[in-house]
């Protein structure tokens, strides 16, 4: 008799789980199931059938065309949507930022991913507005941070048909190229972060008369005291024209200066222009 009751409970549990996946009564059902499961199911079975929730929209994402997305502009009672890297988010609760006449209204009803980096909100060109493959590695990292922000703060609504997703909502070749470039940028950043832990940053100051001054001390960078002072060098990362100042110990200067990159892939050290290789400080103007 108990076995039959146990079977009925498990059958009931499957219906409950189906309702959960449909997004119905999630909190109430979970509380009920967790409260009563132990009365009918063995401990081992409880562990086996423990509830695992997923957001209802993870596997049922809406696919929108550009024309459909443009209608979600907050006018005539419509919610406010925007797209970033082909993912659509409902930002209605941020109306003070995205409403008509507000600072981020430029992004509403479209995918203007590039503008998140460029800051150019004056003109919208649908041919280039979401062409992120033209961005620099650090910009791709910044864009990924923006996407993380929207996933955390706003409601994901679906996918935009275009560069990143096709009519079935599947990732396009373009999207895979973007992911490959993003991975390269992440690897390059990890390399630089590793080098920064080994080669601390410089002290930096600016004056109108002399421009930017960089120099090393035995506490420059992270502020922790070390046994050596070091000499300032430009530290570049892969595909990036910008650089950071790093302090390099004297014992490694000859190797780094001779090889140009010290066997760290595309991460490179360079001397400052018009500055001696053994100078304690260097000056430059941007």
From Swiss-Prot:
Keywords: Coiled coil, Secreted, Signal. Gene3D superfamilies: Cytochrome b5-like heme/steroid binding domain (3.10.120.10). The keyword Secreted applies. Residues 1-23 form the signal peptide. GO terms for cellular component: endomembrane system; extracellular region; membrane. Its main location: secreted. Residues 176-200 form a coiled coil. It is found in: Secreted. PANTHER family: MEMBRANE-ASSOCIATED PROGESTERONE RECEPTOR COMPONENT-RELATED, NEUFERRICIN. The cytochrome b5 heme-binding domain was proven to bind heme, although it lacks the conserved iron-binding His residues at position 98 and 125. Heme-binding protein. This is Neuferricin homolog. The lineage of its organism: Eukaryota, Metazoa, Ecdysozoa, Arthropoda, Hexapoda.
């Amino acid at each position: 008799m108990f076995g039959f009751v146990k079977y009925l409970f498990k059958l009931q549990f499957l219906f409950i789980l189906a309702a959960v996946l449909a997004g119905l009564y999630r909190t109430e059902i979970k509380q009920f199931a967790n409260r009563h499961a132990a009365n009918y199911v063995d401990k081992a079975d409880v562990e086996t059938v423990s509830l695992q929730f997923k957001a209802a929209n993870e596997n049922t994402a809406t696919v929108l065309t550009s024309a459909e997305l443009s209608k979600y502009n907050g006018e005539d009672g419509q919610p406010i949507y925007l797209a970033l890297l082909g993912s659509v988010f409902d930002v209605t609760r941020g109306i003070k930022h995205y409403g008509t006449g507000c600072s981020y209204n430029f992004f509403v009803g479209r995918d203007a991913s590039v503008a998140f980096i460029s800051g150019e909100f004056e003109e919208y060109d649908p041919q280039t507005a979401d062409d992120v493959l033209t961005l620099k590695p650090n910009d791709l990292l910044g864009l990924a941070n923006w996407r993380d922000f929207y996933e955390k703060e706003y409601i994901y609504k679906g996918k935009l048909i275009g560069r990143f997703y096709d009519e079935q909502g599947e990732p396009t070749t373009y999207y895979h190229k973007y992911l490959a470039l993003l991975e390269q940028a992440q690897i390059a950043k990890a390399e630089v972060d590793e080098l920064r832990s080994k080669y601390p940053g410089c002290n930096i100051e600016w004056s109108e008369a002399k421009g930017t001054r960089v120099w090393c001390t035995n506490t420059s960078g992270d502020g922790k005291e070390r046994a050596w002072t070091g000499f300032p060098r430009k530290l570049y990362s892969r595909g990036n024209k910008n650089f950071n100042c790093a302090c390099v110990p004297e014992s490694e200067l000859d190797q780094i200066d001779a090889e140009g990159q010290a066997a760290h892939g595309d991460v490179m050290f360079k001397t400052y222009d018009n500055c001696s290789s053994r100078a304690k400080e260097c000056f430059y103007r941007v």
